[in-house]
Amino acid sequence: MTIAKDMMVNDGIRARELRLIGQDGEQLGVKTKAEALQIAESANLDLVLVAPGAKPPVARIMDYGKFRFEQQKKEREARKKQKVINVKEVRLSPTIDVNDFNTKLRNARKFLEKGDKVKASIRFKGRAITHKEIGQKVLDRLAEETADIATVEQKAKMDGRSMFLTLAPKNDK
C-alpha cells in the first residue's frame, strides 16, 4: 500500500458513502461517512481513505500517525538499500607503456571490485588519430584483462578525438 502525502483523513473525506474496512482488516460493509467516523472515533482511531477511485471509495479504520510513521520508516530503509553506482574514468594513451598500463589496470580493477562502472578513455593527440587501431588494441586488452570481474557494457567507440569503452562489474549474486 503506497502512501500519498495528502491522504484524506477523517473530516477531510468528501464522499458520502464509504466501503469500510475495520482495523483488523475485516469488511464492515458500505456505511455513510458519519457512521464510519463514529465507528472510528469510538475506537480512538482515524478514518483514512485508501482507495478514493473505487465505487464506493474504500476507507480503513487505523491509527494514522502510526501508519505514517511505519511508511516513512519503510521509505528510509528502501533508500538505505539503494546502491549508487558511480562511473569512474581511467585515461589511457595509445602509446601507453607496459608498467603504466598495469597501473591503470590495477585502478580499473579496484573500481570494479568496489561496484563502480569504469569508463576507459583514450585521447588521440596530433597525428595519432590516423592510427585508431592502436587505441582499439589498448582498450581491447583492458577489457580482456578485466574479463573475470567485468563485462563490456559499451564497446569501444570513437567520439571526436577520443575513444571510449565502458565496463560494468559482473553480478555474482
UniProtKB/Swiss-Prot annotation:
<dbReference type="Pfam" id="PF00707">
    <property type="entry name" value="IF3_C"/>
</dbReference>
<keyword id="KW-0648">Protein biosynthesis</keyword>
<comment type="subunit">
    <text>Monomer.</text>
</comment>
<dbReference type="InterPro" id="IPR036787">
    <property type="entry name" value="T_IF-3_N_sf"/>
</dbReference>
<comment type="similarity">
    <text>Belongs to the IF-3 family.</text>
</comment>
<dbReference type="InterPro" id="IPR019815">
    <property type="entry name" value="Translation_initiation_fac_3_C"/>
</dbReference>
<dbReference type="GO" id="GO:0005829">
    <property type="term" value="C:cytosol"/>
</dbReference>
<dbReference type="GO" id="GO:0003743">
    <property type="term" value="F:translation initiation factor activity"/>
</dbReference>
<protein>
    <recommendedName>
        <fullName>Translation initiation factor IF-3</fullName>
    </recommendedName>
</protein>
<dbReference type="InterPro" id="IPR019814">
    <property type="entry name" value="Translation_initiation_fac_3_N"/>
</dbReference>
<keyword id="KW-0396">Initiation factor</keyword>
<dbReference type="GO" id="GO:0016020">
    <property type="term" value="C:membrane"/>
</dbReference>
<dbReference type="GO" id="GO:0032790">
    <property type="term" value="P:ribosome disassembly"/>
</dbReference>
<dbReference type="InterPro" id="IPR036788">
    <property type="entry name" value="T_IF-3_C_sf"/>
</dbReference>
<dbReference type="InterPro" id="IPR019813">
    <property type="entry name" value="Translation_initiation_fac3_CS"/>
</dbReference>
<dbReference type="GO" id="GO:0043022">
    <property type="term" value="F:ribosome binding"/>
</dbReference>
<dbReference type="InterPro" id="IPR001288">
    <property type="entry name" value="Translation_initiation_fac_3"/>
</dbReference>
<dbReference type="Pfam" id="PF05198">
    <property type="entry name" value="IF3_N"/>
</dbReference>
<comment type="function">
    <text>IF-3 binds to the 30S ribosomal subunit and shifts the equilibrium between 70S ribosomes and their 50S and 30S subunits in favor of the free subunits, thus enhancing the availability of 30S subunits on which protein synthesis initiation begins.</text>
</comment>
<keyword id="KW-0963">Cytoplasm</keyword>
